[in-house]
Amino acid sequence: MRKIIIAGNWKMYKTQAESLDFLKALLPKIADDHEEREVVLCTPFTDLGLMSKSLHGTRVRLGAQNIHWADEGAFTGEISGSMLTEMGVRYVIVGHSERRQYFGETDETVNQRLKAAQRHGLTPILCVGESKAQRDAGETEAVIFAQLEQDLVDIDQNNLVVAYEPIWAIGTGDTCDATEANRVIGLIREKLTNKNVTIQYGGSVKPNNVDEIMAQPEIDGALVGGASLEAESFARLVNYV
């Protein structure tokens, strides 16, 4: 049975005060009849402690946006798995395209971060996807398959979420056609040894397209950026029809 996971990635948004205001608005709007859907908020590191306390006893799980592969050490600006688990974090995003593009993360370091997450009992959300140039060149499958092959070396697929995020659709307002997203996610599933891995779609998921996206048979959830920053829009995604 594949788990449905709707995860918000707040990126570098929301102070602690803003996070509390968001939760106060969100929690009453999440329908109780959708308890089989896992709801995750991946917040900035500065929000994790407060959010952990505030989310206790709710159906929302706490996620982080990155993890270092070392358990400790002289790695200025990084955060370890034990630091995250101490905060009550359950999920962690690994290999987001913004990390790969702006901070030089490679498939090798993504693999190391995945291993660190699993070593500490965290469920990693592995992001894979192609650029506009790669899609236009007909390289979508080759790019994604290469990422999967390198990223998943010695990774336990029983504790893994994959997010297909076409880079050209992130924050642009351009959404990958739902049927095309379903096709690509189906190809990703074929490459996995565990066919029950939750595979999300990420890329301009909004209240006006979430129903069509989630109606696709291969899509098990969404990794949401901008639409997760407003309580009303994120609640609409969680409560998709």
Swiss-Prot record:
Keywords for the protein's UniProt record, in alphabetical order: Cytoplasm, Gluconeogenesis, Glycolysis, Isomerase
The reaction(s) this protein catalyses: D-glyceraldehyde 3-phosphate = dihydroxyacetone phosphate
Record bears the keyword Transmembrane helix: no
Top-level class of the enzyme under EC nomenclature: isomerase
Location(s) in or outside the cell: Cytoplasm
Positions of substrate binding: 9-11, 171, 204, 225-226
Catalytic site: 96, 165
Enzyme Commission number(s): 5.3.1.1
Molecular function GO labels: triose-phosphate isomerase activity
SUPFAM superfamilies (alphabetical): Triosephosphate isomerase (TIM)
Domain of life, per lineage: Bacteria
Assigned GO CC terms: cytosol
Pfam family membership, one: TIM
SUBUNIT field: Homodimer.
PANTHER family membership: TRIOSEPHOSPHATE ISOMERASE (PTHR21139:SF42)
Role description: Involved in the gluconeogenesis. Catalyzes stereospecifically the conversion of dihydroxyacetone phosphate (DHAP) to D-glyceraldehyde-3-phosphate (G3P).
Protein name: Triosephosphate isomerase
Annotated source species: Picosynechococcus sp. (strain ATCC 27264 / PCC 7002 / PR-6) (Agmenellum quadruplicatum)
Name of the gene encoding the protein in the UniProt record: tpiA
